[in-house]
Design a protein with these regions (language model features):
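A eukaryote-biased signal for short, well-structured alpha-helical docking elements
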Residues: 1-4
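A composition-driven signal for long, intrinsically disordered, charge-rich low-complexity tracts
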Residues: 7-8, 81
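A short N-terminal beta-strand-loop micro-motif at the entrance of redox/enzyme domains
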Residues: 9-38, 42-45, 49
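Glycine-rich beta-strand-centered segment in the early N-terminal region that forms part
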Residues: 24-39, 52-116
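Short, solvent-exposed secondary-structure boundary/capping segments
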Residues: 45-47, 97, 121-122
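Active-site region of chymotrypsin-like
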Residues: 74, 133-136
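Short, compositionally biased
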Residues: 111-134
Length: 136
């Protein structure tokens, strides 16, 4: 499955791009989530406007390969609150088909590394999120 990503230029928020990527093999311990629906509100504009100062751009960093070169510091993915469905799982505590509500990128899919999994919640334990606020 391909994934589509809505990118925003960090220094010029009205400059945007759509980029597609083929799905990579999912490593052990990760899940792939299809972002089904998300809300676009004034909060999202705040996330973009204060992305550097408040570290919002760091939640879903742009891979250099997504832009065909190292422009990853120039572009970002605005975080959104929404609903997703697990389409692939290599994690023993998360089943394919589970529905999730949470903090996602403006992308059609996202790969997560579930930690602190319980009956009603999980956190993304991706290394780049280790220093970021846990509520997101």
């Amino acid at each position: 499955m391909n994934s589509t990503h809505f990118l925003v230029r960090k220094d010029q928020l009205s400059t945007t791009a759509l980029r597609g990527t083929p799905a990579a093999a999912l490593p052990d311990g990760q899940i792939r989530v299809r972002v089904d629906k998300f809300a676009l509100t004034s909060n999202n504009i705040t996330y973009a406007a204060f992305g550097e100062a408040m570290a919002y751009w760091q939640f879903f960093p742009v891979s250099p390969t997504l832009l065909g070169g190292d422009q990853s510091n120039t572009w970002g993915r605005i975080p959104v609150w929404g609903f997703g469905s697990v389409t692939e799982s290599h994690h023993p505590e998360v089943a394919v088909g589970e529905r999730l509500y949470g903090y996602f990128p403006m992308s059609s899919t996202v790969d997560l590394t579930p930690t602190r999994v319980s009956a009603g919640a999980l956190s993304d334990g991706a290394p780049h999120r280790a220093e970021l606020h846990a509520v997101y």
